């Protein structure tokens, strides 16, 4: 799946850290809104709060957070496959009763940085990329 995103769809693979600081979590809106759903990591003698990533999106979007990107350097497309960590202590997922919820799961994340005028076009492109992956997965033979 990653090979397809990289070679066919021209995404740049990023291997993000699984532990991020509080500033990074605020930068993507995970804090304070979803604080109760986060796994905070305690380090000896450290005053800085650290968290396990709830999604690779947190790291991928922070790659450009404090940047002014020249229009000629757009678009930027990132892909990452990571474990994600969430407590899901709040009401998120309340409408999925009966489903088994996990605190750790794996996910492939796509992030595109484009000009505002090209956002809808890029969203459509991302949807097509995801659809192509799903079609490839449907061709896999089930073996037991």
Task: Label each residue range with its predicted role.
Residues 1-144:
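TRNA-recognition modules of translation machinery and tRNA-sensing kinases, especially anticodon-binding
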